[in-house]
C-alpha cells in the first residue's frame, strides 16, 4: 500500500495515544523509525497488515476496530492537509459523493501520485424507501471496515448527516483477469439517514442522502442533425457497443491505433480492448452495474509499430533490429498499447452503451510514446490541459522524491559518520590515557605537568637471535602473541602502556591519575609479565621466552605531543634511568633501582635480592635490586587466573622461578648464534 496510508496510521496513533505508543508499535512491527512512513514509497500489503496488527495489539482492540477507526481518521486527516475543498465540492449529496469515489480514487492513485495502485470500486443504488445500498468491490478481502469509517465521517463532516451503516451481504468470488486469478470481495451496505429532514427556502424537502431528480424541459430542434462523420470528429475516441458487447461505431482517431479490420461493426469489443479498471469482466451487465465508475481500457494491438515494420524490407528490418538494444527491440516489436479513460453511458434505448473517452495520457513523454501530438485531441478535451499541468507537477514530484532520497542518504551518512566518530574516539582512547583522551575530545587544552610515577621497560634479549630463524610473518605473530599477553596484565593492574618499539615495551604507573601505590602496582605488573611470557616459546632454545625488565621511580614530565597523531609522551631523567635499568639488567630478572625499591616497600610487601652497585650513565655507581616475589599477592591474583589445585603451588612463584632457571640453564649451554642451524618459529 502507498506510504500515505502508513503516515495517516502514524498520525492516528500519535494524536490519540501519544508518541510512546507509536514507538511501541514500531518495535513490535519491526519497522525502523523514519522508514515506516515514506510518503511516495509503495509498501507491500504484508507490511501494512503487520503494522495494523501491531496497532491492534498495542491498543488492545480488534483489527476491525482499528480499520474502522482509521477510515474515519483518513477523511479528517485528508481534509486537514489540503483535500477539504475537493471533498466538499464533489457532490451535494452522499449518493453523488459515493458514486464519484471511484473517479476520486483513480485521480489520486494515477494522476497525483502516478502510482497505478489497485484500488476498490463503489456503486450506489437508491431504494424505494429512501435508503441507499452501497456496493463495495475490492481485491483485498477484510478491509470493508475502512468503508464504514469513511462513509460515516463523510456523512457527518460534509453533509451533517447522522447515518447508520449495516452490512447487508458479503460474498467472495474468484475473478479471472488478464494478470491471473484473484479473489474479489463484494460487500453490500445499507445506509439509513437518522437526521431530521432538511428544507430549502421554498419549503421543499431536500435530501442530502440521495439525489433529487428535477424534471427540466428539454429544448430540441427537430431540424438539427449531426452526421456520423461530424460526430466521429467531435468525439474522435468514442465507440458504441450493443447488448452483445459488439462494436456498432467508433471515432476517427481510433484508426490510428487499431487495425482497420478490427474496427468493423460486429467485432466483439474483447478482441479490441482489455479492461484495466474497474477490474471486472467486460460484458454489458457488468458495465451497467459500474456505470458510474471510471473505465480504463487498453488497446490490445499497436498498429503504429506494425505499420512501420510492414513498410520495411526484410534486410532493413534486420539491420534496424541489430542496432537496437533489448528494451528498444521490445518497444519496436510490441509497441505501446494506447489506454483510454472515460465514462460508459447507457443510451435511451437501454440496448446500447457509448464510451465517451480520451487517451489516458498525462505527460509529454507518454504522448510521444504513443506517436501522438497535442493536436490529436480536440480543443475541448481537458486532457490537453492536464498534460501540460501534469508536466509541471511531475517536475515537482521528481524534486520531492530527490529531496526524500537526499534526506535518507543524509541520515545514512550521519549514522555512518557517528559510527566512524565512535571508532575514532575508541582509537584515541587506546592511544592516550582515557581521561586525557576524553579531555581532548571535549576540546580542552592539555597542559604538560610533572608527576611522581614509576616507569618500566622490558624487552626480549633473545629476540634478535630469533629473527634470522623465523619468517617475517612468524616474527610479527610472535610479537603480537607476547604483547597481547602483556597488555592484558597492564589493563588488569591499572597501569598505562606508553608504547612498544620492536621488542621493547614501555609502561608507567601513577600517570595521569596519581596513586601512592604506583611502584607497588608496577612490581606486580612485572611479575605478571614474567609469568605470561612463559607461554611463548623461543624458536632457538625451544624454551619459554625470558623478559628483561627494568623499573625506576621518580619525577617525570608528561604531556600530549602532536595534533594530527597525538601521543602521550614522558620526559625526564626517570625515563632514562628506567631504560638503563632494563638495558643493564639480565634475562629472566626484574631489576629495580634503589628509589623504585624504596617506593614499592612503602605500600607493598615484596621479596628483593640485592644485586649490588652497577655503573649507570650520568649517575655513576647505583644500588639496584632484583624483584623475586610479592608477599602480598600470589601469581594467580596478579594475572587474575584460577589456580589448578592439583598442579600449581599456592603462590605460584615456585613454578615461575623453576621455569626461569631452566630456561637460563638451557640458553647458556647453547652455541653462539653463528654456529646454529636455522629453526622454525613456534608459538604455543
UniProtKB/Swiss-Prot annotation:
Tell me which residues bind Mg(2+): 459, 503
List, in alphabetical order, the Gene Ontology terms for molecular function in this entry: GTP binding; guanylate cyclase activity; heme binding; metal ion binding
On cofactor binding, the record's note says: Binds 1 or 2 heme groups per heterodimer.
Q: How is its activity regulated?
A: May be regulated by molecular oxygen. Probably not activated by nitric oxide (NO).
Which controlled-vocabulary keywords does the entry list?
cGMP biosynthesis, Coiled coil, Cytoplasm, GTP-binding, Heme, Iron, Lyase, Magnesium, Metal-binding, Nucleotide-binding
Q: What is its EC number?
A: 4.6.1.2
Which annotated residues bind heme? 105
Which positions make up the signal peptide? none
What does it catalyze? GTP = 3',5'-cyclic GMP + diphosphate
GO biological process terms, semicolon-separated: cGMP-mediated signaling; response to oxygen levels
* Xref: SUPFAM superfamilies: Ligand-binding domain in the NO signalling and Golgi transport, Nucleotide cyclase
Loss of function: phenotype: No response to varying levels of oxygen. Significantly reduced aggregation and bordering behaviors.
Q: Does Iron-sulfur count among this protein's keywords?
A: no
The highest taxon in the source lineage is: Eukaryota
Q: Which cofactor does it need?
A: heme
* Role according to the record: Synthesizes cyclic GMP (cGMP) from GTP. Influences aerotaxis responses, aggregation and bordering behaviors (gathering around the edge of a bacterial lawn) in combination with other soluble guanylate cyclases.
Task: Report the sequence similarity comment from the record.
Answer: Belongs to the adenylyl cyclase class-4/guanylyl cyclase family.
State the remark under miscellaneous: There are two types of guanylate cyclases: soluble forms and membrane-associated receptor forms.
Identify this protein by name. Answer: Soluble guanylate cyclase gcy-32
**Annotated gene:** gcy-32
